[in-house]
From Swiss-Prot:
Keywords from the UniProt entry: Signal
Family listed: Belongs to the UPF0482 family.
Biased composition (Polar residues): 39-48
Basic and acidic residues bias (residue ranges): 49-59
Matching Pfam families: DUF1283
Signal peptide bounds: 1-28
UniProt name for this protein: UPF0482 protein KPN78578_15540
Region (Disordered): 38-60
Top-rank lineage group of the source organism: Bacteria
């Protein structure tokens, strides 16, 4: 019985010692914490290149937007002109869809209804 108790104490001591060694070794590996802000030379260079590309394509985007706006305005004006031409009291007025103008049937000239 005395021998079994000694074995248990010995085993417990060995387990405790190995646990201490294990935890101290894992603690030693993480005794420093390095936090990077992500602000490295490479990320700054990439951000600079992206900004440059964005600025280079800005004028192109503006041109596309202006053209789309002009086309929209043109279609809007033509729709209003067609509506006014068809509502006109002038019986000789007709809408020419190819030229988007209100014309006189007799003369073929553009009229303002």
């Amino acid at each position: 019985m005395n021998m079994t108790l000694n074995k248990r104490w010995c085993l417990t001591a060995i387990l405790a010692l190995s646990a201490v060694v294990y935890t101290s070794s894992s603690y030693a590996a993480t005794d420093r914490l390095v936090i990077e802000s992500g602000d490295s030379a490479q990320s700054r260079q990439q951000a600079s290149m992206e900004k440059e590309q964005w600025n280079d394509t800005r004028s192109l985007r503006q041109k596309v937007n202006k053209r789309a706006e002009k086309e929209w305005d043109k279609a809007d004006v033509a729709f209003d002109a067609q509506d006014n031409c068809q509502k006109s009291a002038n019986v000789n007025a007709y809408w020419e869809p190819n030229t988007l103008r209100c014309l006189d049937r007799r003369t073929g000239r553009a009229i303002n209804p």
